[in-house]
Design a protein with these regions (language model features):
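Short, basic (Lys/Arg/His-rich) helix/loop patches that form interaction surfaces
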Residues: 31-36, 90, 94-101, 111, ...
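Short, polar N-cap/turn motifs at the start of nucleic acid-interacting alpha helices
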Residues: 125-132, 233-253
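C-terminal secondary-structure termini that scaffold catalytic or DNA-interacting sites
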Residues: 94, 130, 143-157, 161-168, ...
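N-terminal DNA-binding recognition helix of tyrosine site-specific recombinases/integrases
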Residues: 2, 10-25, 29-70, 114-116
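Catalytic-site neighborhood detector that most strongly recognizes the C-terminal catalytic loop/helix
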Residues: 75, 83, 139, 167, ...
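N-terminal DNA-binding module of tyrosine recombinases/phage integrases
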Residues: 1-21, 59, 172-185, 192, ...
Length: 279
């Protein structure tokens, strides 16, 4: 969307590295429309799409070299997830009760799905007999259209056991839905799926309206993982439920939580062995 207004009238053979570099620098300045610069991640994604097109042009021998090579990009900012305490989670759910956000928040806190996976859920993904949820689709927005896609990796498709309280909530919600509505579990009033950005905006407005600590919707996934590991649930089980492609990814992301759990285990072992008979 940003590339065409900038370079749409430029002849392919005349597009130079220096032109793209100047454009990158301009994207890092405050936008007249929003008053804010684009994030480094957004700029990187824009350049990835442009570079892919230029790479194709090189393959077709339309240009000799990819003008997107050797560009200086802004450094990506490492985001530190914000985690709610159990008391804050309870307050969040209390504020959301009787609102359209209650069900998606319950799903997210109990299952820790990525946003696109959550929004792609349909009723046929829930097996009410076994209490199992099948995660196999991802909802994305392409050219302002909402579509579902298959996961990129095998670990992205998985089956998760649903906690009893959430399963009962899902049953009750399904019974209340009007016949003929779209099959999406998390949906707008007319039954249509949310666009990812508009859903995140709805969540941010909810937090602000209820004077709750600001977190990203994705942070709820980290909250789910932190709760699991703090309860002593095996990191391997957490990996499978979260859909991480490897055990090491789970260990790397949540090493700080695991250190705390390990210390608690050491303290319990110490108490069990030596509280009555100190060494």
């Amino acid at each position: 969307m940003r590339v065409i207004p900038q370079f749409g009238d430029t002849c392919l053979q005349q597009l130079k590295n220096i032109d793209i570099q100047k454009w990158i620098f301009s994207l890092q300045k405050a936008s007249p429309r929003t008053g804010k610069p684009l994030s480094p991640k957004t700029i990187k994604n824009i350049l990835l799409n442009l570079s892919a097109a230029m790479k194709k042009a090189v393959m077709l021998e339309l240009i000799p070299k990819n003008p997107c090579d050797d560009l200086t990009l802004p450094k990506l900012e490492h985001y530190q997830p914000k985690v709610y305490s159990m008391e804050e989670v309870e307050t969040l759910l209390q504020c959301a009760r009787n609102t359209a956000l209650y069900l998606p928040l319950m799903i997210e806190i109990c299952l820790g799905l990525r946003r696109g996976k959550l929004l792609a859920l349909r009723w046929h993904h829930v097996d009410f007999q076994t209490g199992c949820l099948t995660v196999e689709e991802n909802l994305v927005t392409v050219n302002n259209q909402t579509i579902t896609k298959a996961p990129k990796t095998q670990s992205g498709r998985r089956e998760i056991q649903i906690p009893g309280t959430l399963l009962r909530l899902l049953k009750g919600t399904k019974a209340e839905r009007h016949a003929g509505q779209n099959d999406y579990i998390v949906c707008q009033e007319d039954g249509s799926p949310y666009k990812s950005d508009s859903f995140s905006m709805k969540f941010r407005r909810f937090l602000k309206a209820n004077d709750l600590k600001h977190i990203r919707f994705h942070d709820l996934r980290h909250i789910n993982a932190t709760i699991m590991l703090s309860l002593g649930i095996s990191p391997k089980v957490a990996q499978e439920r979260l859909g991480h492609s490897s055990y090491q990814i789970t260990m790397d992301i949540y090493s700080h939580v695991l250190k705390k759990v390990e210390q608690e285990a050491a303290d319990k072992l110490d108490a069990a062995l030596f509280e009555q008979n100190p060494a």
